[in-house]
Amino acid sequence: MGSRGNFGSKLGVILATAGSAVGLGNVWRFPYMAGQNGGAAFILIYLVCIILLGLPGMMSEFIIGRHSASNAARAYSNLGKNKAWGTVGLVGVITSMIILGFYAVVAGWCLQYLYASIIGGVHGDPEYVKTYFQTFASDPIRPTLWAVGFILLTHAVVVRGVRNGIEKASKILMPLLFVLLVVIVIASCSLPGAMKGVQFLFHPDFSKVDENVLLEALGQAFFSLSLGTACLCTYASYFSRQTNLLKSASQIVVIDTLIAVLAGLMIFPAAFSVGVQPDSGPSLIFITLPNVFQQAFGDMPVVGYIISVLFYALLVLAALTSTISMHEIGTAMIYEERKITRAKGAWIETITCSIIAVFCSLSQGAVPGLGFFGKDFLTNCDNFTAQLLMPLASIVTCLFLGWYVPKKIVRDEFTNWGTVSGKLFPVFLFMIRFVSPICILLIFLHQFGVI
């Protein structure tokens, strides 16, 4: 089976873990929510939610993962001194597998659009761009091949191990992602009328803040950091005893939020320069933004071409940093529990997630009715993980660490065995015992329309 491996540097820890949090949601969800819900007012509320929920949630998974130095399922059972607790970690692993299956479909769309941008395939009037996406997404072959191809690309990184695969890739992908983002932000903000978009994103409008906005900010803080997927727990199992958990968690939150805000500066200035009101989700990046870039840089077609290519390259990088972490969660559990090689474990994970991806891809129009409860299979997978599995795993994690695990173990991990200040430990313990579980419960009820 071989050794588990570990991250070789502090930078590797930060970039790899931040990469797991940074994904397509930073581009297609956060900017739209901020712009629609009070701009800077929403961002401020979001930061408060990060403190109330995000940081305690990350720290909880970090502590469980590092203490056990094993896969997520074994981490919970070892710390809880009972195999039944391993179910919590197993739920996280299953969640990550399902998410990787449907996430790879959208990531595959990004690959197709990167290729199409390079050859000029998505250049045309708004109706053409819309039809292009609908036709492609409903095709039975191409999107499915791209999805499986993306999982294989992810596999190629994960199979090389923690230090030679995940860490090395993160040290390349994350800086490159940031550079591409900054280049597009500069180009977007230089357009005529771009400042209207900047104002839309950053002008604080507290009149828009209501109960719903507060709950949306809580939800964004929860989902943006990959809580409840066993990702943070798995990555923390590769941390050294010298890793300052609170400092690392804070740095990761800053990177994740910074990239989300920069994504807003990439989207809104360009959109407002041509009088387009951006939406969210896949339609934003596959229909709205191709039209926006064509119109905004219409007088500079070469620049428009470059920006389009860079944008989809950016999306591919953002998706890949996320899929690497999702793949590693299942791979680690499979090869450790079955006592096989990492390569064999990675292949089992790849094949399993590819099967899920095929069903998700075909449900987008190629096979009408492929799904349940009036929803397509991809949406079913999304709802099942986001509305049920992730909140369930997270709330149990907080209660498990806050009430069941011996306080001394939690304190020792929090303070790196007394080498780091423990002044905030009582605050952390209060958060995971009371505040974070209540916040997660509110998110759960809000998703089902109860509140």
Place the predicted regions along the sequence by residue:
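Loop-to-transmembrane helix boundary motifs in multi-pass membrane proteins
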Residues: 6, 11-13, 20, 144-145, ...
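Membrane-embedded translocation segments of transport machinery
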Residues: 2-3, 7, 11, 167, ...
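Hydrophobic transmembrane alpha-helices that form the core helical bundles
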Residues: 54-71, 86-132, 316-333, 391, ...
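Membrane-interface "cap" regions at the ends of multi-pass membrane proteins
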Residues: 1-28, 57-62, 66-79, 83-90, ...
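C-terminal membrane-solvent junction of multi-pass transporters and transport-like membrane proteins
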Residues: 88-91, 337-350, 382-440
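Extracellular loop-to-transmembrane helix junctions
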Residues: 5, 34-60, 142-143, 389-393
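Inter-helical loop and helix-membrane interface segments of multi-pass membrane transporters/permeases
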Residues: 2-5, 32-37, 67, 72-91, ...
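Transmembrane helix-boundary motif of multi-pass solute transporters/channels
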Residues: 12-47, 236, 247-250, 254-257, ...
